[in-house]
């Protein structure tokens, strides 16, 4: 297990030096443990660049180690043998908009009462499943309804996304109305190159391709909304964040009645784990309180 723990630390920290600091051993000891594990398995497990990252084989070993660690942590908890400080670490993949809205409410009870340390990895809702596939997380929030092998897929609910803009932005870029021609000259905000919501909205309602309009990339939900309020861009905003901005008059919906309904699902390892069950129960319960039911939206926006 020491060799597996060393591999996990190196991949998570991105370097042998930081892994050594985390494990409270020398850098050479960490390097030796990883090398011994590679020799034992006959596979290269990490690519020794900066930052260090796992090979495909390393990802599979890491996934196996994390599953074992989760079950071991549960056993220790049952025997009152958590780590030295009494915490259990849990890695989850989540999209930025969920993290800014309903997701913290879902986890607050468990984090406080189960003494969990959360390691949240933020990705677009179309891309979080890759984190699960690579073994980086035990579960993820995703817009895909397709369960991966060895995992469960639990429906959570739907988030409506609406294209919002300020009055100043509309006056500058859309003086003659919201048209496809005007969109081709107007800057649009996107979270990252993986964010496809703007592309889908413009393709679905205006027939505009993904490279036919200027865009800002803003990898922060808060800054994303701020750019829109300042009149520097328009963009797809989840209803929970957008509704107060609309009510205050800071922004308005560009095309009322035209929106994207993004479904969310909880994908998690299919383990006989009390922690996995409790996580799932908390997420489902909070989603029922804060997200829309699936049957409210006849057309859902799945990854393409």
Segments predicted by a language model, with ranges:
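A short LG(V/I)-centered, amphipathic sequence patch enriched
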Residues: 38-56
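A late-sequence structural motif
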Residues: 256-300
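Residue cluster at the C-terminal edge of the helix-turn-helix DNA-binding motif
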Residues: 13, 22, 36-44
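Alpha-helical linker/hinge and terminal dimerization helices associated
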Residues: 40-41, 61-83, 283, 290
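Short helix-boundary/capping micro-motifs
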Residues: 8-24
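C-terminal regulatory
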Residues: 153-232, 246-259, 289-304
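Residues within the DNA-recognition helix of helix-turn-helix
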Residues: 26, 33-36
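Central regulatory/effector-binding core of bacterial HTH transcription factors
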Residues: 85-149
């Amino acid at each position: 297990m020491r060799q597996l723990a060393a591999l996990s630390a190196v991949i998570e920290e991105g370097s042998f030096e930081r892994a050594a600091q985390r494990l409270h051993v020398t850098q050479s000891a960490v390097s030796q443990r990883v090398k011994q594990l590679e020799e034992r398995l006959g596979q290269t497990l990490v690519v020794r660049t900066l930052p260090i990252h796992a090979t495909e084989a390393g990802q599979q070993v890491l996934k196996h180690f994390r599953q074992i660690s989760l079950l071991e942590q549960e056993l220790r908890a049952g025997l009152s043998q958590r780590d030295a400080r009494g915490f259990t670490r849990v890695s989850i993949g989540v999209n930025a908009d969920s993290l800014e809205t309903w997701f913290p409410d879902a986890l607050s009870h468990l984090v406080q009462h189960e003494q969990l340390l959360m390691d949240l990895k933020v990705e677009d809702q179309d891309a979080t499943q890759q984190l699960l596939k690579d073994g980086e997380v035990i579960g993820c929030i995703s817009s895909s309804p397709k369960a991966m092998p060895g995992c469960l897929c639990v429906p959570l609910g739907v988030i409506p996304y609406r294209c919002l803009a300020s009055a100043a932005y509309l006056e500058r870029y859309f003086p003659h109305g919201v048209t496809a021609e005007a969109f081709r000259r107007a800057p649009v905000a996107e979270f990252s190159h993986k964010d496809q919501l703007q592309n889908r909205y413009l393709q679905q309602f205006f027939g505009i391709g993904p490279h036919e309009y200027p865009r800002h990339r803003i990898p922060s939900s808060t800054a994303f909304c701020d750019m829109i309020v300042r009149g520097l861009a328009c963009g797809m905003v989840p209803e929970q964040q957008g509704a107060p901005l609309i009510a205050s008059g800071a922004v308005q919906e560009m095309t009322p009645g035209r929106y994207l309904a993004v479904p969310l699902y909880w994908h998690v390892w299919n383990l006989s784990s009390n922690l996995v069950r409790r996580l799932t129960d908390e997420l489902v319960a909070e989603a029922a309180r804060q997200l829309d039911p699936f049957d409210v939206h006849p057309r859902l926006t799945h990854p393409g």
